[in-house]
């Protein structure tokens, strides 16, 4: 796994969603607990590429995800991308992201988890995880400053580069570097 540091979790979501090759991706599942930073980013790409967004099924009380119903959803309509918050910023509900990601991987879906409300607070290990991209914000449960965010890139799926520019390495090459994460972090970041 590698870590990419854009300036916020919102930019991280845009870099991930924008880096997906949408030509072969038609079905996206989201939890009903998503932050608007995630949903607005996803909606932008839905308008561009016309894929379907479906909410993951809730239990009878409407308060938690129903993993059995979700498995049936995936059987009926194969997931290409699954997007989930790790923790709801409204209710505090901790979603079963590992379990749902494992179900999604049975269909080779890309799994993105918004961990902005969780990283630093809820234990997570991506070492053997089915999660491809884990997004975080420095100013929330990591208690850092505004203007830092990122994502843990734990995937074989190669994202297209969304932004081009200086990287401080391989300067004679006009293509963005493909190795590591430097190609996803062009320009000079804020430093304190």
Which residues does each PLM region occupy?
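Pyridoxal 5′-phosphate
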Residues: 1-192
């Amino acid at each position: 796994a590698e870590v990419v540091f854009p300036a916020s979790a919102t930019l991280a979501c845009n870099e991930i969603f924008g880096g997906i090759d949408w030509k072969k991706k038609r079905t996206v599942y989201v939890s009903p607990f998503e932050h608007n930073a995630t949903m607005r980013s996803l909606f932008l790409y839905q308008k561009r590429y016309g894929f379907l967004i479906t909410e993951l099924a809730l239990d009878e009380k409407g308060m938690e995800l129903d993993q059995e119903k979700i498995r049936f959803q995936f059987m009926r309509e194969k997931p290409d991308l699954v997007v989930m918050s790790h923790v709801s910023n409204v209710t505090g509900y901790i979603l079963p992201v590992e379990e749902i990601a494992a179900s999604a991987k049975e269909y080779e879906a890309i799994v993105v988890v918004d961990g902005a409300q969780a990283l630093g607070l809820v234990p997570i290990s991506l070492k053997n995880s089915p999660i491809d991209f884990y997004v975080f914000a420095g100013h929330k449960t990591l208690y850092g400053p505004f203007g830092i965010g990122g994502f843990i890139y734990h995937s074989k799926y190669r994202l297209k580069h969304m932004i081009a520019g200086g990287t401080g390495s391989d300067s004679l090459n006009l293509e963005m570097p493909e190795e590591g994460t430097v190609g996803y972090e062009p320009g000079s970041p804020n430093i304190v």
